[in-house]
Amino acid sequence: MSSSDSRPAQKADTKLAHAGRDPLAFHGFVNPPVVHASTVLYPDTATMVPGGQTYSYARRGNPTTNSLEDAITEIEGAAGSKIANSGLNAIALAILSCVKSGDHILITDTAYGPTRHFADTVLPNFNIDVEYYDPKIGARIKDMFREETTAVFTEAPGSLTFEMQDIPAIALAAHEIDATVLMDNTWASPLYCQPLAHGVDLSIQAGTKYIVGHSDAMLGTIAASERAWKGLDRLYGAMGCHAAPDDVYLGLRGLRTLSVRLERHQRNTRAVLDWLSQQPLISRIRYPALESDPGHALWKRDFSGASGLCAFEFADGTSREQSLAFLDALRLFGLGYSWGGFESLAIPVNLNGMRTVTAPPQDVQSVRLHIGLEDPEDLIKDLDQALNKTFA
């Protein structure tokens, strides 16, 4: 069993199964140990004083965390990776690694809600100017650059409304002024999109979602390009970040089955959306993998697959009360704000306070769905009975 450095080029499924694994380093066991320890001992002062040892203190890593970091680095094609204790923690660390007091950062108007909250409530305290941009801006983002612009934060597709972005064009423009490009890639996972290959410098995943995949651990990952790695590594050590070893191990376990699960999520989602699109009570589906979606061409160019997160809008005239009654009538779909696990979920979409430069649709009742691993026929039956109960 050889390390990744000596393995031939591999396809994505094979990388997911083997990345970060070195069984011979652990007496032949196929999985690394789950290290529960804070203190690291040295054999002598000659080793201790100059720091000539791989591990010095658990906050800086252990064999468990290094296994996941190595796996993410290989899968993302990165210079290095870091593990955070949640997706939001990963987002905050990534942003703080490339901005300082007096800087200007551009953030997509369709960013994840907690990302906006961090940008609006934390960054101004560091004298960092936050400005939001229309996700459809593409190369025209250069018109928003200032002398103090140092970072552009992207997310594709957009949170709740699923707009696609021309990531390569944005990255090319940003690099002309030496700005760092960040991307929240949680929707697609590193299996279906490789942000660094499109010019992104910091690829961020809420590992809680598809990487863990079982709704039983919280995790975040950050994969850095060569130009962004030094800043991320330096900040990570200074911030005292460390993810719990059991959560890290569950992330490693989830990686091994990521392709199998996402294939099912994608297939189930297409089946459910094909049915939903035929319902007269539904006016629009938001899912970039559909040919009818405005962002389909960008999705097809830059992504190799789609996940289970989508949304739909009710027909005109549907009231807020009817939309909520529909959700209450669901039996299989749980009402919960997370996604990426085995279970199907639904939430009402509320864009109040969530958009700055793009106008949210007025009086449109929308529902976000996460399509899980259940049989799609059962999911369709659940949606059907909820529609009938609500609109009978």
Predicted features and spans:
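N-terminal glycine-rich, Lys/His-bearing helix-loop that initiates the first secondary-structure elements
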Residues: M1-G52, A392
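PLP-dependent enzyme catalytic core of the Aspartate aminotransferase-like
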Residues: S2, D120, D129-E131, G317-T318, ...
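Conserved PLP-enzyme active-site core in the AAT-like
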Residues: S2-P8, L16-D22, S81-Q279
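Conserved N-terminal alpha-helix of the aminotransferase class I/II PLP-enzyme fold
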Residues: T39-A92, P114-T121
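Structural preference for beta-strand elements that scaffold enzyme active sites
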Residues: A151, T180, L202, R284, ...
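Short, well-ordered beta-strand elements within core beta-sheets of diverse protein domains
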Residues: G251-V260, G308-D316, V367-G372
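Conserved small-domain helix->loop->beta segment predominantly found in fold-type I
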Residues: R270-R331, L335-G340, L351-P361
